[in-house]
Swiss-Prot record:
Belongs to the G-protein coupled receptor 1 family. Glycans are attached at residue 21. Phosphorylated at two clusters of Ser and Thr residues located in the intracellular C-terminus. Prerequisite for FFAR4 internalization via an ARRB2-dependent pathway. It is found in: Cell membrane; Endosome membrane; Lysosome membrane; Cell projection, Cilium membrane. The modification Phosphothreonine is found at residues 347, 349. The modification Phosphoserine is found at residues 350, 357, 360. Residues 1-21 are annotated as: Disordered. Keywords: Cell membrane, Cell projection, Differentiation, Disulfide bond, Endosome, G-protein coupled receptor, Glycoprotein, Inflammatory response, Lipid-binding, Lysosome, Membrane, Phosphoprotein, Receptor, Transducer, Transmembrane, Transmembrane helix. This is Free fatty acid receptor 4. The lineage of its organism: Eukaryota, Metazoa, Chordata, Craniata, Vertebrata. It comes from Rattus norvegicus.
Length: 361
């Protein structure tokens, strides 16, 4: 072991012979060979584009939602979703640094925090989507019974639970990710890598099963059940729409259309999440299986592109949300920028439209 690698590992608990002799998965560290420059430029271009789109999209979505000055539970959860996306994509610059340097040169502290923050923010995202679907279902049931929605304390407690549980569930990654020296395929010497170093196989298997079940499968089941129930209620309500005497007919249709738009948007967010997060969940399970099947090879480059695909979800979420619910606002911004005369007209009409709530509370 070179002195540099020995210093990089830093102080920590003593490692068992099994941990020392084990070949660890290098995650973002990789030896790219002769095409290193071309591959690094391609990776930087893709992740850089995702980072810019995600940053602008989520910030604009936050501003547009806050400007409506609504304080419902759905609004709080949607804002929480955008914040989680911003936190998740904040890891992109660090990932690019590792892809350029190949070896891990960011130190042990960043090694502990990088994957922890990524996992925690991903957990917050799916739990928030599950909470949104559950809140929508409960809200519809409450409205049918003439009851009010959850108060601010309940909303704050729900957000605190989502972040607190996600932080605790991902805590083993913060503890067990460490910098170790390892010789990678294609390399001629050991280099420091940031990897997950479990003390035993049982703990690794237990945590993987626990995390995938409680942070992916269970929220997914909640989402499916909630939206199925919402769909049933929506169909039944539309059949009775013309028979209701509580509101005028035009108001009933307007509310129904708004609820349907919100339902469709949140459903798209849910579908996109499962499509774009399923590959990384499967890859993590394959990395676990790789410990027992040495003939199963998972290249770090494959892991990178799977993570890049997952990063893209954070850029897609605000696009889906904005295009579905804020078309008029984006049209106004476009016209104000390119056609100032038309922008004034959109500004006047948007003031009247702001009185209508896109997100029912």
């Amino acid at each position: 072991m070179s002195p540099e690698c020995a210093q990089t590992t830093g102080p920590g608990p003593s490692r068992t012979p099994d941990q020392v002799n084990r070949t660890h998965f290098p995650f973002f560290s990789d030896v790219k060979g002769d095409h290193r420059l071309v591959l690094s430029v391609l990776e930087t271009t893709v992740l850089g584009l995702i980072f810019v789109v995600s940053l602008l999209g989520n910030v604009c979505a936050l501003v547009l939602v806050v400007r409506r000055r609504r304080r419902g539970a759905t609004v709080s959860l949607v804002l929480n979703l955008f914040c989680a996306d911003l936190l998740f994509t904040s890891a992109i610059p660090l990932v690019l640094v590792v892809r350029w340097t190949e070896a891990w040169l960011l130190g042990p502290v960043v090694c502990h925090l990088l994957f922890y923050v990524m996992t925690m923010s991903g957990s917050v995202t799916i739990l928030t989507l599950a909470a949104v679907s559950l809140e929508r279902m409960v809200c519809i049931v409450r409205l049918r019974r003439g009851l009010s929605g959850p108060g601010r304390r309940t909303q704050a407690a729900l957000l605190a639970f989502i972040w607190g549980y996600s932080a605790l569930a991902a805590l083993p990654l913060c503890i067990l990710f460490r910098v170790v020296p390892q010789r990678l395929p294609g390399g001629d010497q050991e280099i420091p890598i940031c990897t997950l170093d479990w003390p035993n196989r049982i703990g690794e298997i237990s945590w993987d099963v626990f995390f995938v079940t409680l942070n992916f499968l269970v929220p997914g089941l909640v989402i499916v059940i909630s939206y199925s129930k919402i769909l049933q209620i929506t169909k039944a309500s539309r059949k009775r729409l013309t028979l209701s005497l509580a509101y005028s007919e035009s108001h009933q249709i307007r509310v129904s259309q708004q609820d349907y738009r919100l339902f469709r948007t949140l459903f798209l967010l849910m579908v996109s999440f499962f499509i774009m997060w399923s590959p990384i969940i499967i890859t993590i399970l394959l990395i676990l299986i790789q410990n027992f099947r040495q003939d199963l090879v998972i290249w770090p480059s494959l892991f990178f592109w799977v993570v890049a695909f997952t990063f893209a979800n954070s850029a897609l979420n605000p696009i889906l949300y904005n295009m579905s619910l804020f078309r008029s606002e984006w049209r106004k911004i476009f016209c104000c920028f390119f056609f100032p005369e038309k922008g004034a007209i959109f500004t006047e009409t948007s003031i009247r439209r702001n009185d209508l709530s896109v997100i029912s509370t």
